[in-house]
Amino acid sequence: MNTVSSWIAIAAVVTAPLGAAAAQAPDGAIERAVAAWAKVRTLRGTFEQTVTNSLTGTSAKSKGEYVQERPNRMAIRFAAPMTDAIIADGKVVWVYLPSSAPGQVTKRPATDRSAVPIDLAGEFLDAPRTKYDITPAAARTVDGHQARGFVLVPKKGVAAPFTKATVWIDEDDSLIREFEIDEPSGVIRHIHLTSVEVNAPVDRKAFNFPIPKGVKIVDQTKP
């Protein structure tokens, strides 16, 4: 299982009567989202996740908490009965997934963002028009917030942990409220951020990962 990872895009609903005004709308939306994310230093809240495997026809739901301190600290902890956790402490990324890989914890370089991005929205907000092909998605209401939908597909040559992503951005504060990613394995991962708190104080202890007793460390930080 990969981490909560995924993010933002830009599109327009173009109709003949609207002409050029419609074509300009997505630029404003993405710029507002980029500007809003630039002001975020910390992020914390709760999430719900649904993972669907099209090959097996199964799905699983889970929930948990996340804490992020940009640029390189992240803690994602799943709620009981799961004990899975993904912790980026600023130096390495610890991936502990006993629900799918029992008895081990993987230690990855903090620079390895291919499978475990450590920036909740940076994957989408870093030059999105350059990196992704964009199309519109249906808007929806997320926890009482009107949210615009966008689809992005990585352009040829762009490395990304997904083949397609759909995101919903709050029309009021331009923050991501919900997103869905299609992974190369065929898994579809839907994330609903049930609460979002921006720039609140965070305890650095949240980014500590005490290694569980008896687990094997798979060290991928060495060549």
Predicted segment positions?
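Bacterial N-terminal signal peptides that target proteins for export
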Residues: 1-11
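N-terminal leader/targeting segments and the immediate start of mature chains
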Residues: 11, 19-61, 73, 211-223
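Extracytoplasmic/secreted envelope proteins and their assembly/folding machinery
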Residues: 27-37, 90, 118-121, 166, ...
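Extracytoplasmic
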Residues: 40-42, 61-63, 69-71, 81, ...
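A generic structural motif
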Residues: 48-54, 77-79, 96-98, 153-155, ...
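An acidic-aromatic
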Residues: 65-117, 189-192
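Flexible, surface-exposed loop/linker segments and immediately adjacent secondary-structure boundaries
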Residues: 101-146
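Gly/Pro-enriched, hydrophobic low-complexity segments
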Residues: 130-214, 219
